[in-house]
From Swiss-Prot:
Organism: Schizosaccharomyces pombe (strain 972 / ATCC 24843)
UniProt entry keywords in alphabetical sequence: ATP-binding, Cell membrane, Glycoprotein, Ion transport, Magnesium, Membrane, Metal-binding, Nucleotide-binding, Phosphoprotein, Potassium, Potassium transport, Sodium, Sodium transport, Translocase, Transmembrane, Transmembrane helix, Transport
GO biological process: intracellular calcium ion homeostasis; monoatomic ion transmembrane transport; potassium ion export across plasma membrane; potassium ion transport; sodium ion transport
GO cellular component, one term: fungal-type vacuole
Membrane-side (Cytoplasmic) residue stretches: 1-61, 105-281, 335-760, 809-844, 911-939, 991-1037
Protein name: Sodium/potassium exporting P-type ATPase cta3
Annotated gene: cta3
Length: 1037
C-alpha cells in the first residue's frame, strides 16, 4: 500500500488545512470517481494479517488425513507385492479422494470467507454529497466518515465535528476509560503528543462509546496505528514465547517451549486442533480407526504365524481398508458447506462454523423485542398532555406524515382514554396547532437525531432510530419538523441517550436568545427529574396520576416515553455544563405512546419453538406493560392469562426485580421468567448464567455495544445485521440479515436438519465398515490348499463399496430435506453430539447383520451349492481352480452393494418403515406417496440408481472383473443374492419396528402439548405446579 505523504502530522493541522491537503470537501466528500481512483492508488483498507484461504494447507490436510494414510500404506504394500493393478486402483482412488476432498474443502473455506464479508463492518461515508453505508474495506484517504455510538472506527480519522464524542481505545493504548474527543483541539508543532492524547483523532478499530462525529480519513490498512501494531506482531511471528537465556531454569523452559511448538504443529498437521468440534471428533475417529486397521493387519499376520507372504499382505490390506470410511471427511465438508449456503438463503450468516453445529441443540432463546419480534417501524399512536387530554394517530404508513388521521379528546388529568374513546374528534394538523401542543412538538422534533424528508418523486425517506423517527413524523404532521425549527433555533449542546439512565436531552437557543432544554426518555427516569407540570408544582398525587396514565397506555402494548422541557440560563461554557444540572427541575410536558406492531410471522415462530421444546424469553428495555402486551400477542404469554392472574408475577419481571434476586433464589425457581422488562445489559448476562446453571443451551440476540458480553456468554450469539452495531456483530456467532425472530427459528430448523443428515450419512458409512470387518475377520478361517486365508472380498471390491457405492449416496443423505417432525422433537444434547447411544447401537446391529448375510452368501455358494474347493493363490490370480471362489466373491460383492444402497434409503428415517418414511397414518397411504418418498431427494435417488447399475459392468466386463476386482461373472448365484438382500431388508424393518415399540412418544415430543395448551388457570394448581407443567415437561427425560 502506498504511504500517504502530507506536510505535517494531521493532529498538528487545523481542519481547513487537512481538508485542503486531502483534496476533499467536508460537506460533499469525495466524488465516486475520485474515490475509485484513490482505491486503485492506495489499495483496500485491510490489514495484511491473513493471507486468506491457503490452497496448499487444505491439500496437506487431505493428504495427511488418517483415511488417506491407510490407503497410501495399502498402495505401497500392493506395489511392494508387485500387484500393480491393485496398487494402481488404490492410487487412483487416493488421487480421486484427495481431489474431491480438496475441491470441496477449498470451496467451503472460500464460501466461509465470502459469508464473513457479508457481515463485515460497514462505514457511513459521504461521497458526491450523499451519505451511504459502504464496506469499510473500500475506504480511501480523503473520505468523509460519519460515526455514531456503537460503531467501530473503520480507519484512522482526523475529526472535523464532534458531539459528546468518546471512543474506547483500550486496544491501542490499554486505557480502560473512554477518551473524550474534540475536533477543534490543536497542538504545537514541536509538542510531543502521545497516541492517547491526540484527542482530535479517532483510530481504526476503536469503539465509539458515546455521541457522534465526522472525520476525514487520513490513513487506511497497514498505514493505520492498528496496522503498525499488526506489522510489529508479524515481525515477532511467534505463536509461543521463547524463553530468554538469562531466565531461571532456562533449559527446562526451552524444552517445554520446543515440546509445545512441536505438539501444536503436529496436531495442526494431523487436523486435531483445527476445524469445528464435530470435525475434530471425526478426525479423532479417523485416527482411532487407523489404529484399529493396524491391529487388524497384525491379527491377519498372527493368524498366519507371522509368515508374511504376498497373499497374507494382500489380506491385511483388505482388512485394513475395510475399517476406514474413506469418504467421511469429504462428505462432512460438503454437508457443512451446503449448510452455510442454506443458512444464507434463509437470511442467516454463519460467522463461526461451531454455531452451525450447535443451533440444533438450542433449548432457550433470549430475544430482544424491538425489530426482532416486532417490525421495528414505530408510529406515535397515542399522546397524553396533562393540560389538554389525548391525541390519537391512525396511519397505514409509519414514515409518511401526510397519510392518516389525528383525533383529539380534551379531558381532565384523571380521565382514562379507554372510557372515552368514542368522544374523540378529528383534528386537522395543517392548521396552526394549539399552544398546548407547541412544547410537545418542539421536544419531539429537536430532541431527535432522525431525519424525515420527501424526495423529488414524493417518496418519504427516513433515517435514524425507529423511536425517534416516530416522534419526528408526528411533529412533521403539524409542520413542526426539525428542519423547520432549525430556521429559528440554534443547536447548543446534546446529552446523548445513555442505556444506564435511559434518557436524552438537548439545548437550543431561539431567536430571542432564550436557552431551552428538551428531554425525552423512560417515564420513571424523566419524572424523577421533573419538578413542575403545566406551570404548577408537581405533587405526589400528580406523579401517581401520570404513572396511572402511563400504565393505561402501556396496557395497549404501547412503548411509553415521557417528554419534558425547561428554560435554562446561559452557561459560561456549555461543554462543561454537568448533565445533572441541565436535566434538573424539568417541566413535565407529555406522555407519548409509540407502537411497534409484531411481525406477522412472529406468532407462528414462537408457537413452532414451543412445539420444538424451545423456551422463548423476551428481554427488552420497554415498560413491563408494553412488554407484556406484545408477549401475549405473539404467544410468549398465553392470551388467556389475565393481568390479575397470580401466575403473571413470575411470567413477567422487571430487570431490577430479577437483579435483586440472588443466584440461590434464581436457582430455587422451577422456571425462569418469560419476560424481563426494563432489562439492562448486565441483566441479560445474569439470565444467561442462570440458564446455564440449569444446563440450558442458550441463543441470545443483541444489537448494541452493551450486548456484546451477553452475546459472548451465550452458547450461540445472534447479532442483528440491519440495526446491529459492529461490536455486536463481532461478538456474535451468526448474524440475521433481516433482524427477524422467525429467521432464528429457521436457523435452528436448518441446524437440526444438518445434524440429522450428518447422523444419517455417518451411520450409512460405518454400517458398511462394520459389516466388511466382520466378514473379513471371520473369513480368516477359510484356508486354501496351502493354509492361507482366502478373502471373501478383495481390496478393490472393498474400495469400490466404500468409495463409489457409499460416497455418493452419503452426499445425497447430506442433502436430505428436514423431516416433517424436525421441529416436533426435543433439542439434541450438544455434549453427546452425533455419537449417541442409539446411533452406536444401530451401527452395530445393522453392521452385524450385513456381515452375517454376506458371510452366509459366501458359505452357501462355496459349501452349499459349490464344491468348497478354495484351491490356491486365489487372492492374487484367477485360474480354473478359483472359479467357485471368484463367483462367491462376486455374489458377496453384489450383496454388500445392494444392502448398502438399501441402508441409504432406510436411514432417511431412523424409526419409520421404508414404506412410510414420513410416518403418515396408514389410512392416507398410497403407492404414489411411497414412490414420492423414494425419489424426492433426486441426488440420492440418482446416486443409488447409478451405484446399483455399476455392479454389473464390474462383474461382466472381461479383464476388469478377474484382474482388477478378483471376481467373475455369475448366473444362478443371483438367486442367492436376491434372497440375502431380502433377508437384510426384512431384518432392518424388524429392527425399526422394535425401535418404534421401545420408543416413548412423549420423549420424541410427538404428542407434547404446546405452551398454550399446557397452561391452565385452575385454582387447584399452585404456582410451582403450574411452572412445573409449563416447562419441566419439555426438558429431556
Amino acid at each position: 500500500m502506498v504511504t500517504i505523504n502530507i506536510s505535517n502530522p494531521v493532529y498538528f493541522s487545523d481542519i481547513k488545512d487537512v481538508e485542503s491537503e486531502f483534496l476533499t470537501s467536508i460537506p460533499n466528500g469525495l466524488t465516486h470517481e475520485e474515490a475509485q481512483n484513490r482505491l486503485s492508488e492506495y489499495g483496500e483498507n485491510r490489514l495484511e494479517a491473513d493471507s486468506g484461504v491457503s490452497a496448499w494447507k487444505v491439500l496437506l490436510r487431505q493428504v495427511l488425513n488418517a483415511m488417506c494414510v491407510v490407503l497410501i500404506l495399502a498402495a505401497a504394500l500392493s506395489f511392494g507385492t508387485t500387484d500393480w493393478i491393485e496398487g494402481g486402483v488404490i492410487s487412483a482412488i487416493i488421487v480421486l479422494n484427495i481431489t474431491v476432498g480438496f475441491i470441496q474443502e477449498y470451496k467451503a473455506e472460500k464460501t466461509m470467507d465470502s459469508l464473513r464479508t457479508l457481515a463485515s463492518p460497514m462505514a457511513h461515508v459521504t461521497r458526491s454529497s450523499k451519505t451511504d453505508a459502504i464496506d469499510s474495506h473500500l475506504l480511501v484517504p480523503g473520505d468523509v466518515v460519519v460515526l455514531k455510538t456503537g460503531d467501530v472506527v473503520p480507519a484512522d480519522l482526523r475529526l472535523v465535528e464532534t458531539v459528546n464524542f468518546e471512543t474506547d481505545e483500550a486496544l491501542l493504548t490499554g486505557e480502560s476509560l473512554p477518551v473524550i474527543k474534540d475536533a477543534h483541539a490543536t497542538f504545537q508543532m514541536n509538542e510531543d503528543v502521545p497516541i492517547g492524547d491526540r484527542i482530535n483523532l479517532a483510530y481504526s478499530s476503536s469503539i465509539v462509546t458515546k455521541g457522534r462525529a465526522k472525520g476525514i480519513c487520513y490513513a487506511t490498512g497497514m498505514q493505520t496505528q492498528i496496522g503498525a501494531i499488526a506489522a510489529g506482531l508479524r515481525q515477532k511471528g511467534k505463536l509461543f514465547q521463547r524463553p530468554e537465556k538469562d531466565e531461571p531454569n532456562y533449559r527446562r523452559k526451552l524444552n517445554k517451549y520446543y515440546l509445545k511448538v512441536t505438539s501444536y504443529y503436529v496436531q495442526r498437521v494431523l487436523g486435531l486442533n483445527v476445524g469445528t468440534p464435530l470435525q475434530r471428533k471425526l478426525t479423532v475417529l479417523a485416527y482411532i480407526l487407523f489404529c484399529i486397521a493396524i491391529i487388524l493387519a497384525i491379527i491377519v499376520m498372527a493368524a498366519h504365524s507371522f509368515h508374511v507372504t504376498n497373499e497374507v499382505s494382500i489380506y491385511a490390506i483388505s482388512l485394513g481398508i475395510s475399517i476406514i470410511p474413506e469418504s467421511l471427511i469429504a462428505v462432512l465438508s460438503i454437508t457443512m458447506a451446503m449448510g452455510q449456503k442454506n443458512m444464507s438463503k434463509r437470511r442467516v450468516i454463519v460467522r463461526k462454523l461451531e454455531a452451525l453445529e450447535a443451533l440444533g441443540g438450542v433449548t432457550d432463546i433470549c430475544s430482544d423485542k424491538t425489530g426482532t419480534i416486532t417490525q421495528g417501524k414505530m408510529i406515535t399512536r397515542r399522546v397524553w398532555i396533562p393540560s389538554y387530554g389525548y391525541l390519537s394517530v391512525d396511519t397505514s404508513d409509519a414514515n409518511n406524515p401526510t397519510i392518516g388521521t389525528v383525533s383529539g379528546l380534551e379531558a381532565a388529568m384523571q380521565d382514562v382514554l379507554k372510557e372515552k374513546k368514542q368522544e374523540m374528534k378529528n383534528i386537522d394538523p395543517s392548521n396552526q396547532p394549539s399552544d398546548q401542543f407547541i412544547p410537545l412538538l418542539k421536544t419531539c422534533a429537536l430532541c431527535n437525531l432522525s431525519t424525515v424528508n420527501q424526495t423529488e418523486t414524493g417518496e418519504w425517506v427516513v433515517k435514524g432510530e425507529p423511536t425517534e423517527i416516530a416522534l419526528h413524523v408526528f411533529s412533521k404532521r403539524f409542520n413542526y419538523g426539525k428542519e423547520d425549527l432549525l430556521k429559528t433555533n440554534t443547536f447548543v449542546r446534546e446529552y446523548p441517550f445513555d442505556s444506564e439512565i435511559k434518557r436524552m436531552a438537548v439545548i437550543y437557543e431561539d431567536q430571542q436568545g432564550q436557552y431551552t432544554v428538551y428531554a425525552k426518555g423512560a417515564v420513571e427516569r424523566i419524572l424523577e427529574r421533573c419538578s413542575t407540570s403545566n406551570g404548577s408544582t408537581l405533587e405526589e398525587p400528580d406523579r401517581e396520576l401520570i404513572i396511572a396514565q402511563m400504565e393505561t397506555l402501556a396496557a395497549e402494548g404501547l412503548r411509553v416515553l415521557a417528554l419534558a422541557t425547561k428554560v435554562i440560563d446561559k452557561a459560561d461554557n456549555w461543554e462543561t455544563l454537568p448533565r445533572d444540572v441541565a436535566e434538573s427541575s424539568l417541566e413535565f410536558v407529555s406522555l407519548v405512546g409509540i407502537y411497534d406492531p409484531p411481525r406477522t410471522e412472529s406468532k407462528g415462530a414462537v408457537e413452532l419453538c414451543h412445539r420444538a421444546g424451545i423456551r422463548v424469553h423476551m428481554l427488552t428495555g420497554d415498560h413491563p406493560e408494553t412488554a407484556k402486551a406484545i408477549a401475549r400477542e405473539v404467544g410468549i404469554i398465553p392470551p388467556f392469562i389475565s393481568d390479575r392472574d397470580p401466575n403473571m408475577s413470575w411470567m413477567v419481571m422487571t430487570g431490577s426485580q430479577f437483579d435483586a434476586l440472588s443466584d440461590e433464589e434464581v436457582d430455587s425457581l422451577k422456571a425462569l421468567c418469560l419476560v424481563i422488562a426494563r432489562c439492562a445489559p448486565q441483566t441479560k448476562v445474569k439470565m444467561i448464567e442462570a440458564l446455564h446453571r440449569r444446563k440450558a443451551f442458550v441463543a441470545m440476540t443483541g444489537d448494541g455495544v452493551n450486548d456484546s458480553p451477553s452475546l459472548k456468554q451465550a452458547n450461540v450469539g445472534i447479532a442483528m445485521g440491519q440495526n446491529g452495531s459492529d461490536v455486536a456483530k463481532d461478538a456474535s456467532d451468526i448474524v440475521l440479515t433481516d433482524d427477524n425472530f422467525s429467521s432464528i427459528v429457521n436457523a435452528i430448523e436448518e441446524g437440526r436438519r444438518m445434524f440429522d443428515n450428518i447422523m444419517r450419512f455417518v451411520l450409512h458409512l460405518l454400517v458398511s465398515n462394520v459389516g466388511e470387518v466382520i466378514l473379513l475377520v471371520v473369513g480368516l478361517a477359510f484356508r486354501d490348499e496351502v493354509h492361507l486365508s482366502v478373502f471373501p472380498m478383495s481390496p478393490v471390491e472393498i474400495l469400490w463399496c466404500n468409495m463409489i457405492t457409499s460416497s455418493f449416496p452419503s452426499m445425497g443423505l447430506g442433502m436430505e430435506l428436514a423431516q416433517p417432525d424436525v421441529m416436533e422433537r426435543l433439542p439434541h444434547d450438544n455434549k453427546v453430539g452425533i455419537f449417541q447411544k442409539s446411533l452406536i447401537v444401530d451401527m452395530m446391529v445393522y453392521g452385524f447383520f450385513l456381515g452375517v448375510v454376506s458371510l452366509m452368501t459366501w458359505v452357501v455358494i462355496m459349501y452349499g451349492f459349490g464344491t468348497g474347493n478354495l484351491s490356491y493363490d486365489c487372492n492374487a490370480h484367477y485360474h480354473a481352480g478359483c472359479n467357485d471362489v471368484f463367483k462367491a466373491r462376486s455374489a458377496v460383492f453384489a450383496v454388500v452393494t445392494f444392502c448398502i444402497l438399501i441402508m441409504a434409503v432406510e436411514v432417511k428415517n431412523f424409526d419409520n418403515s421404508l414404506f412410510n418414511l414420513h410416518g403418515i397414518p396408514w389410512g392416507e397411504w398410497n403407492f404414489r406417496y411411497f414412490l414420492h418418498t423414494l425419489v424426492e431427494n433426486k441426488f440420492l435417488a440418482w446416486a443409488i440408481a447409478l451405484a446399483a447399475v455399476s455392479v454389473f459392468p464390474t462383474i461382466y466386463i472381461p479383464v476388469i472383473n478377474r484382474d482388477v476386482f478378483k471376481h467373475t461373472y455369475i448366473g444362478w448365484e443371483w438367486g442367492v443374492v436376491a434372497v440375502a438382500v431380502m433377508f437384510y431388508f426384512f431384518y432392518v424393518e424388524i429392527w425399526k419396528s422394535i425401535r418404534r415399540s421401545l420408543t416413548n412418544p412423549q420423549k420424541k415430543g410427538k404428542f407434547r402439548r404446546t405452551l398454550s395448551n399446557t397452561i391452565t388457570t385452575e385454582s387447584k394448581l399452585s404456582e410451582k405446579d403450574l411452572e412445573h407443567r409449563l416447562f419441566l415437561q419439555s426438558r429431556r427425560a
